[in-house]
């Protein structure tokens, strides 16, 4: 490393190099890549951090060289956002400006990091590279990477990607391909970057699905709490036994049509607990939106190896009073019915809605739940074993993420979300079954 930047606090010092641009290590297609309205609604950077217990002196070079080779397959990630003649956003694959890559070292052991599922933003910023042009849409890189070595021999890999390029499932495919190439193997997944099958219909046809995409207001004045109080982002532990008890409760009070999944019952618990912790008024509309992968619903039209966004957000909508008064089995039925509504027509309606209306942020009366429990990041073996932990940061107050907890029975779950300080203890008590 030639030049370094020091990032220091009372506990942790990270010394990192100036970024170098990693380019695809071979010829790649040129031109521009179509972005769907779904992609354009996802214009936000997402940081993730992976911890690895061991590496060696070559870890940085191996990962950097593998990045260059994997970008031959995932070349749009080396491009930049641009606008076409109609003012629509695309990815410019002509210039190939590359992916900023940073090498860093920390003054501690990797165990000192503790639980990284929801890192404080000040700590996270030490281990991921945020490009200074991040807010300049047509200049900023779509992907950055930072490898940080620790005194114990372990390392972290911090990745920041623009969500317009990929959802969680496609991100897993990219990371697996990167790791395979680092181990000297060919990539087992060949991505397809054609997104034109997600073009909106002319004219738009939204129909009965409008309420699934609309926003709801805040008549409970919850926004004031968020503005006046610190927002506490925290990981709440739900063990497998609690989850089994909850599933039994959700199917024994006579309201359930059938058994429900861990995701559904956990979503019901969190939605109800958050609604009560935020002290929503009985007639306040509360909205639960669930990230649902629509790949299985679009098999006839989706190209093999599709790389991009393929999620929709079906909605459950009711008043806070209705939600709190009903048995949890009724809440799980709401959620199951919302998920069951996702078919090709729903997906097409969502695309049309996103093309017709400008994006508006969700208000605090809404909760958006995403599950990372099924994302198999344990196979990201760059040559020294897979990652022990996965973490994130920069969640919005409306976001909630379910993650797997490391446990013997593999059934424990971490619920990660942010709340106003005054609501944290109440939420904690309500999710303890």
Kindly label every feature range from the protein language model.
Residues 1-14:
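PEST-like, low-complexity acidic/proline-rich intrinsically disordered segments
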Residues 364-433:
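Low-complexity, glycine/alanine/valine/leucine- and proline-rich hydrophobic stretches
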Residues 32-34:
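Detector for long, low-complexity, acidic/polar
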Residues 39, 142-148, 397-406:
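Short, surface-exposed beta-strand/loop micro-motifs that present aromatic residues
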Residues 11-28, 42-43, 47-76, 80-366, ...:
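Soluble acyl-CoA-dependent acyltransferase catalytic core bearing the H(X)4D motif
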């Amino acid at each position: 490393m030639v030049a370094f930047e020091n990032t220091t606090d009372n506990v942790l010092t990270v010394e990192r190099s100036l970024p170098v641009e990693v380019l695809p290590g071979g010829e790649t297609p040129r031109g521009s890549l179509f972005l769907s309205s779904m992609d354009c609604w996802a214009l936000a950077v997402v940081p993730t951090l992976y911890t690895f217990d061991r590496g060696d002196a070559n870890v940085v070079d191996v990962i950097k060289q593998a990045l260059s080779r994997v970008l031959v397959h995932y070349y749009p990630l080396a491009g930049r956002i641009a606008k076409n003649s109609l003012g629509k956003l695309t990815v410019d694959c002509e210039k190939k400006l590359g992916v900023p890559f940073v090498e860093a070292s920390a003054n501690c052991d990797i165990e000192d990091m503790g639980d990284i599922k929801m890192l404080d933003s000040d700590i996270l910023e030490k281990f991921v590279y945020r490009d200074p042009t991040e807010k300049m849409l047509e200049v900023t890189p779509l992907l950055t990477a930072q490898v940080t070595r620790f005194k114990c021999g372990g390392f972290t890999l911090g990745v920041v990607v623009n969500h317009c390029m990929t959802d969680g499932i496609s991100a897993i495919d990219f990371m697996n391909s990167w790791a395979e190439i680092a181990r000297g193997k060919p990539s087992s997944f060949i991505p397809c970057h054609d997104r034109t099958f997600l073009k909106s219909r002319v004219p738009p046809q939204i129909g009965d699905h409008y309420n699934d995409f609309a926003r709801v207001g805040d008549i409970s004045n919850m926004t004031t709490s968020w503005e006046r109080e610190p927002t506490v982002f925290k990981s709440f532990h739900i063990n497998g036994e609690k989850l089994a008890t909850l599933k039994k409760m959700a199917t024994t009070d006579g309201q359930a049509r059938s058994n429900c999944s861990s995701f559904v019952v956990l979503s019901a618990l969190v939605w109800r607990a958050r609604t009560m912790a935020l002290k929503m008024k009985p007639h306040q509309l509360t909205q639960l939106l669930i990230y649902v992968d629509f790949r299985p619903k679009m098999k006839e039209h989706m190209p093999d190896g599709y790389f991009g966004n393929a999620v929709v957000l079906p909605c459950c909508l009711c008043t806070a009073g209705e939600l709190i008064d009903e048995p949890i089995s009724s809440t799980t039925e709401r959620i199951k019915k919302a998920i069951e509504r996702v078919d090709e027509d729903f997906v097409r309606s969502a695309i049309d809605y996103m093309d017709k209306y400008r994006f508006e942020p969700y208000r605090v009366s809404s909760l958006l739940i995403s599950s990372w429990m099924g994302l198999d990041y344990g196979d990201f073996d760059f040559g020294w074993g897979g990652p022990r932990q996965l973490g994130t940061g920069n969640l919005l107050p409306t976001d909630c993420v379910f993650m797997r907890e490391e446990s013997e029975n593999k059934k424990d779950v971490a619920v990660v979300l942010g709340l106003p300080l005054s609501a944290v203890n109440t939420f904690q008590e309500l999710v303890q079954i």
